[in-house]
Amino acid sequence: MSYTLDSLGNPSAYRRVTETRSSFSRVSGSPSSGFRSQSWSRGSPSTVSSSYKRSMLAPRLAYSSAMLSSAESSLDFSQSSSLLNGGSGPGGDYKLSRSNEKEQLQGLNDRFAGYIEKVHYLEQQNKEIEAEIQALRQKQASHAQLGDAYDQEIRELRATLEMVNHEKAQVQLDSDHLEEDIHRLKERFEEEARLRDDTEAAIRALRKDIEEASLVKVELDKKVQSLQDEVAFLRSNHEEEVADLLAQIQASHITVERKDYLKTDISTALKEIRSQLESHSDQNMHQAEEWFKCRYAKLTEAAEQNKEAIRSAKEEIAEYRRQLQSKSIELESVRGTKESLERQLSDIEERHNHDLSSYQDTIQQLENELRGTKWEMARHLREYQDLLNVKMALDIEIAAYRKLLEGEETRFSTFAGSITGPLYTHRPPITISSKIQKPKVEAPKLKVQHKFVEEIIEETKVEDEKSEMEEALTAITEELAVSMKEEKKEAAEEKEEEPEAEEEEVAAKKSPVKATAPEVKEEEGEKEEEEGQEEEEEEDEGAKSDQAEEGGSEKEGSSEKEEGEQEEGETEAEAEGEEAEAKEEKKVEEKSEEVATKEELVADAKVEKPEKAKSPVPKSPVEEKGKSPVPKSPVEEKGKSPVPKSPVEEKGKSPVPKSPVEEKGKSPVSKSPVEEKAKSPVPKSPVEEAKSKAEVGKGEQKEEEEKEVKEAPKEEKVEKKEEKPKDVPEKKKAESPVKEEAVAEVVTITKSVKVHLEKETKEEGKPLQQEKEKEKAGGEGGSEEEGSDKGAKGSRKEDIAVNGEVEGKEEVEQETKEKGSGREEEKGVVTNGLDLSPADEKKGGDKSEEKVVVTKTVEKITSEGGDGATKYITKSVTVTQKVEEHEETFEEKLVSTKKVEKVTSHAIVKEVTQSD
């Protein structure tokens, strides 16, 4: 510790320092004394070391605490000295230092007192700890003595334990020996018990034997007694008999005896008698023995002789017994089989009865369902009639609009003709041709309608004969036929008046527009409303008139067909058209004979009629009827379906609604793909052939132009068709069973359609021989008939035939030939959901129709909104380009060129809409 001079000079500080030193000495002394006072004992080294450690800890703690306190006090002194030295004045500084020193001294004294108390406390604890250490040392000494005693006891106990174990082993051996002895004794005991039981059983048996023997003895005694009695009785009897005999003898020899008596004794006489009797008895005995011996010998001989027979008899008996047992066993088995068979028979009878009842129930249910379907057919016919009425009204309105449009068009054409000479010059000849063609075609329209109604009536009559329900249906169909005839006649008359101006422009386009005409009428009419362009409306109206002409030409008599052929005489295929018509007539006759099959097809047609009516466009029913090759089948008349081309599609109408749905949308009355397909293939034969011939004269390029022109309206139709199919597939699903029945007639219908196709392909295919060959092959194959324009079309038809979509392809190809590739696009969309553009491209050849056909986009468009129209417009724009290329070459040809121009402008407008 460091102390300043000031602090040492100060007496109070010196006093404090000395006190701290003295306290330090005390503190340091106390531990030393405590350390010395510890008692050392000669215990175990562990105890000594522990006590030493504990004794050393306390003084060290005390010493360290004392040192800390001294250091603190020194610090305090240094601080106080610094305060004293740092004072400003001698007087004030001294007072302050004194007051501070007092406070510091008080604090230090308090701390010192606390340290002293702590030291006393620690000394007390050291004493207690030393006492504990001493006690522990004593305990350790006592524990050592106890350990020796315990060890001795443990040794003794171990010895005793070993002895006990030895004794235990000996006892265990003894117990084992005893157990063996016990086991052995048990065995002996059991054996003795068995012997005792055996002896007791023998005793019981002997007792029984004794009892039996005693009984036998008693019986024998009784027999002996009875025999003795019998012997006595026999003796008495014998004696009596002897006495009697003697009496008799004596009586007979009385005199003699009397004499003898006098001489002999009775005893001698008795002896003589006895001797005589004995001699007689001996003789009798000998005789009996001899007889017995002889008899016995004879019997033994007979027995020996019969032994063999007896043995054989015994063997036979044994054999018979064995056979009897086997037969009895067989009998039991046969009885079991009989019972099982009877049970099976009863089960089979029960099952048969149950099945019979179930079949009867199913038959009843089917009959009820048949009645219900017939009533539904009647209801659908009524709905169909109502829709036809609506259609006729709409046709009238369309005709009125057409007149207005024609008037405007004539004014526009006159105005344009004054400006552009060549175009004006082309129009007048076109109007002449249209006037000539339309009246011829429209007149057959009425006839075609009559034929369609009559066929329905005949088929329904056949059904009436079968059931009363069918009679009701026939009545309904007759009423419908009358109303349809009237309405159709009115519509036909109006159409005949109106389409003259339209045919002037559309004369060359009749063939491409024919198949799509019904659809073009409705759907292009909607386009006209949306776009507000009169040019497309005129095209739609022209298509309507063309379709009406087609339907009329097909259903007219041979005279009307001859007229159509004269008109078609301009082309090279007039003979082919006549042949196709003759084939159609033959098919009509064959189908009239097949009334039963027609009835089924009539049901199908009836079911399909309401569907046709349901579709928004009413144009198709009239056109379909006109287009269908006369009464080939109600399906063809109603559906005009190339669906019959492959029965797969009819069946697939419900499962594969893609084609039926879109096709239905294409034509309101179209039953499904049937109408669209029928529209293209069937009507081509009479009227379309003429139109196609005219087109052939113009060239295939013109046909392609017309196809392109129609692609836009057809695409718009596709949109509507896609919307309509949603409701149609459900109807077809319900009608699918009835449609499947009509498959047989459908095949015949396809043949007629094939004939038409062949005619058309021949007309168009004279420049192209390959197309004709493919169409002929398609007529044979069924699915390859219609794809004839190019080799690619044939291959595509085959692919579609696998999917049940051949009908769509056939229609598409036919339409592309005469009416434009627009149909192919629509139907391709319906069936495959894929682009049929490759087929169209191949058909187009060098005209770049590939750009026009994009069927996938058509499928995506389900609404009639501007989006779907825009996509179709894009196609029409490409068509416009193609048309422009051909316009230069074919301007001299009829209004087709003019219509191409109109379509071009319309397509351009649509293109602008798309870009927006």
Swiss-Prot record:
Keyword annotations from UniProtKB, A to Z: Acetylation, Cell projection, Coiled coil, Cytoplasm, Cytoskeleton, Glycoprotein, Intermediate filament, Methylation, Phosphoprotein, Repeat
Main location, first listed in the record: cytoplasm
Location of region: Coil 2B: 292-412
Biased composition regions of type Basic and acidic residues, renumbered to the chain: 542-561, 583-614, 686-701, 707-742, 755-778, 788-828, 839-851
Region ranges (Linker 12): 249-265
Record: glycosylation sites: T47, T431
Sequence repeats: 614-626, 627-639, 640-652, 653-665, 666-678, 679-691
Chain segments carrying region Coil 1A: 105-136
Biased composition (Low complexity): 21-44
Modified residues (Phosphoserine): 30, 99, 226, 346, 418, 467, 483, 511, 545, 553, 558-559, 641, 646, 680, 685, 736, 783, 821, 837
Modified residues (Phosphotyrosine): Y320
Quaternary structure and interacting proteins, as annotated: Forms heterodimers with NEFL; which can further hetero-oligomerize (in vitro). Forms heterodimers with INA (in vitro).
GO terms for MF: microtubule binding; structural constituent of cytoskeleton
Comp. bias regions, Acidic residues: 493-505, 521-541, 562-582
Modified residues (N-acetylserine): S2
Region described as Disordered: 1-51, 485-851
UniProt feature, compositional bias: Polar residues: 1-10
Protein name in UniProt: Neurofilament medium polypeptide
Residues annotated as signal peptide: none
Region ranges (Linker 1): 137-149
Post-translation changes: There are a number of repeats of the tripeptide K-S-P, NFM is phosphorylated on a number of the serines in this motif. It is thought that phosphorylation of NFM results in the formation of interfilament cross bridges that are important in the maintenance of axonal caliber. Phosphorylation seems to play a major role in the functioning of the larger neurofilament polypeptides (NF-M and NF-H), the levels of phosphorylation being altered developmentally and coincidentally with a change in the neurofilament function.
Pfam families: Filament, Filament_head
Family: Belongs to the intermediate filament family.
Omega-N-methylarginine PTM positions: R42
Organism: Homo sapiens (Human)
